[in-house]
Amino acid sequence: MCEPPPGFITVQCYTSDDLLTGDSTIVKSIPVRSCFFRQGVEVVLFRCESNKHRWSKIRGPVSLTVHCDICEFRETVVIPSLPKGFKVSSDFSYSVTWNCCYSRGRTE
């Protein structure tokens, strides 16, 4: 049995202005230990809009679905809310497939 290293999903929010500057706001880093990450960290970018004049209108939650084909495991992690002053510009869901820790067969 192999032990996959812990991986993190780094969720970043970008606005229209950020497209010009290349900046983005890190929303949250979520540990996902169920799957084997190819590079250790997966960065998820989604579009959001800064709403500085209406701070109370923050949309959430944002759902990320992680599934692994080899071990047929599926996990959904939820970001409770966005930072103050940001909202998702449209309904957002993100699904991604990573390589699992392959526990069957020969292990090194």
Swiss-Prot record:
Keywords: Host-virus interaction, Inhibition of host innate immune response by virus, Suppressor of RNA silencing, Transport, Viral immunoevasion, Viral movement protein. It comes from the Viruses. The keyword Transport applies. GO terms for biological process: symbiont-mediated suppression of host innate immune response; transport of virus in host, cell to cell. Transports viral genome to neighboring plant cells directly through plasmosdesmata, without any budding. The movement protein allows efficient cell to cell propagation, by bypassing the host cell wall barrier (Potential). Also likely to act as a suppressor of RNA-mediated gene silencing, also known as post-transcriptional gene silencing (PTGS), a mechanism of plant viral defense that performs sequence-specific inhibition of viral mRNAs expression. Silencing activity has been seen in Nicotiana benthamiana and Nicotiana tabacum, two non-host plants. This is Movement protein P1. It comes from Cocksfoot mottle virus (isolate Dactylis glomerata/Norway/CfMV-NO/1995) (CfMV). The lineage of its organism: Viruses, Riboviria, Orthornavirae, Pisuviricota, Pisoniviricetes.
